[in-house]
Amino acid sequence: MNKEILKLNKIDQSVWIDSISRGMINTGKIKSMVENGISGITSNPSIFQKALSNEDSYDDEIKLLTESGINDPKKIFQKLSIKDISDACKILLPVYENKGGSDGFVSIEIDPKFSKDTDKSIKEGIYLYESINQPNVMIKVPGTSQGIPVIEKLISLGINVNVTLLFSRDMYRKSAKAYIKGLEKINTEKTDIRYVNSVASFFISRIDTEVDKVIDNKNKGKVAIWNATKAYEDYEDIFSKDNFKNILNKGGKAQKLLWASTSVKNPNYNKLLYVENLVAPNTVNTVPEDLYNEILNSEINYSSFKQSKNNYDDSEIIDNDKLNIITGELLEVGIKLFEDAFDALIKEIKNKIS
């Protein structure tokens, strides 16, 4: 166990890796990361697109699939990604079991083209969950208005959910409440509520990238952390109410906030800015490989969330209306980026089978 990751674990923060590929699995790289303290994996279309472009480790399976009569690029991608996620789940299963089902998850995203189609998202979420057939898989659902009922439905069926592309506190609160509604609808005679989990992926650095363009210099590099501290206040409020206490008494768990997009985009910022200032109990920080390596080779001097929050004056940090416009735009941009990455990976598969 790496001492810096252990330091975060002692505050009850998990560190996940925001990367996966067939090569990482086959070479033992993911296993090594888990030995260092990584306790979960997140994936998205961009990650899979890079894996397919940069590795030849998928080529033999693609050939076998086409020879078996599967020529639809999306179906081929589903087969490839389902295998990767299933294999990764098996590597992390001991973590999941040791943590009593509260950690050790691997996330896979619903087709981003379904981000605004509730019915198709539910159908695909169920398909992926049943196909992977591992207790520690999480289905990623975008935090759109159409995604809110998807969260509730999948949770009610006992399917773990990672709510992704959350930029605004409003959408975070809606996703947390959808999770609670889903738990309330679980048939406890068929599903053990103790093993139904969710994380809410709250994006960080992309906010500063956009907000820094329109605010005073004194607040540059601060708004994303401030926004996260306010979301954490929302988390504490939502999961302390009486209706959730009833769920807790039945064995249910609070939805964890997961800090996503935590590598700095501005080269002038400390590389650990969104690690050291986002340490809070019952949270996750998912990091790309370069930030993971930075953590391994650095000494983390973290601030408590209370300290981070006290650094900012709510009235001066940013106008709420302006922030809401920016976070709404970031959601749309995020969806488009994932759609484009999905199109690119489908094109990559077409090229491999032609």
Residue ranges of predicted features:
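Active-site-adjacent beta->alpha loops and helix N-cap segments on the catalytic face
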Residues: 24, 117-123, 141-155, 168-179
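Catalytic alpha/beta core domains of metabolic enzymes, predominantly
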Residues: 159-290
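Flexible, acidic glycine-rich loops studded with aromatic residues
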Residues: 251-353
